[in-house]
């Protein structure tokens, strides 16, 4: 009925909300749930204010909100695709694997093409800081644990243990995910763009047609929007990320932005180039390559 019984439940709801079409914390006009309910300490609880639940829950919810905001370019593009094609943002596993029993048996789903979401379903028992575990199915192919960067081979059922800082969230190898710095509101201009790729096993070619519009009006119905084709190409040990010239425009579109590239699960490169010029503004740590490309034309 929307009542929040404990902090652990609140944090898990926020994690699920971050990977839902709509994320919000309110269910009615009040900050607290009324009428009052009996709680062990005499306090009604039910608050929708994350800081009312202590530092551990606050940190967990803050991380979920930041992750949701960082994924806004990915989510906004897929919401436009859902509008155009009817293919939902949240997809049952059976849409991609209709013949597999596991696709119906596990309560998990795809969030676009890249993410596999398996929400934490069982409480730890202490209501705040505990560890819980759940089983899930990883389809064939390689998948990355989003929170650790560890690569796993699919085609199996696994058990994942998590505290409130994480939950079972996996990214398909070969994926290209556009991200941004979390801002004050989701329709803020896309002035910072991070292209995060997840290294495949072998060769691959992945595209993502990034969509942008003003975000707060209906001018997109008049064709006022912009699309930018992003490509991640891996072949013979060479990885390439390319950004094509945008198609279309709208008055509020940014003319330039800060661009970064991240590649998860890649060995340390011998050479990095940007537009054919040797680049020295890169770092590599624990199989994560980060390239700071600076300000580029949008």
Each language-model region and where it sits:
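Beta-strand residues in well-ordered beta-sheet regions across diverse protein folds
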Residues: 118, 146, 242-244, 292
């Amino acid at each position: 009925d929307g009542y929040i019984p404990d902090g652990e439940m609140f944090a898990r709801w926020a994690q699920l909300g971050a990977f839902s079409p709509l994320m919000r914390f309110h269910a009615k006009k009040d900050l607290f749930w009324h009428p009052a309910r009996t709680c062990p300490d005499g306090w009604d609880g039910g608050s929708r204010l994350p800081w009312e639940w202590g530092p551990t829950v606050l940190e967990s919810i803050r991380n979920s909100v930041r992750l949701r905001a960082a994924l806004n370019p990915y989510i906004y593009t897929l919401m436009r695709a859902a509008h155009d094609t009817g293919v939902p943002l949240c997809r049952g596993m059976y849409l991609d694997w209709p013949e597999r029993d596991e696709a119906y048996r596990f309560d998990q789903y795809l969030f676009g093409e890249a993410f596999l979401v398996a929400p934490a379903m069982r409480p730890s028992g202490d209501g705040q800081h505990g560890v819980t575990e759940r089983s899930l199915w990883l389809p064939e192919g390689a998948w990355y644990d989003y929170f650790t960067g560890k690569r796993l081979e699919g085609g199996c059922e696994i058990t994942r243990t998590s505290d409130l800082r994480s939950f079972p969230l996996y990214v398909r190898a070969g994926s290209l995910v556009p991200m941004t710095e979390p801002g004050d509101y989701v329709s803020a201009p896309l002035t910072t763009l991070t292209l995060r790729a997840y290294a495949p096993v072998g060769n691959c070619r992945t595209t993502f047609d990034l969509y942008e519009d003003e975000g707060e009006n209906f001018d997109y119905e008049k064709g006022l929007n912009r699309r930018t084709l992003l490509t991640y190409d891996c072949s013979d040990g060479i990885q390439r990320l390319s950004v094509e010239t945008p198609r279309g425009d709208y008055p509020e579109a940014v003319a330039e932005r800060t661009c970064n590239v991240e590649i998860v699960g890649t060995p340390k490169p011998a050479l990095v180039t940007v537009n054919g010029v040797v680049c020295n503004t890169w770092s590599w740590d624990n199989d994560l390559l980060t390239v700071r490309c600076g300000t580029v034309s949008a």
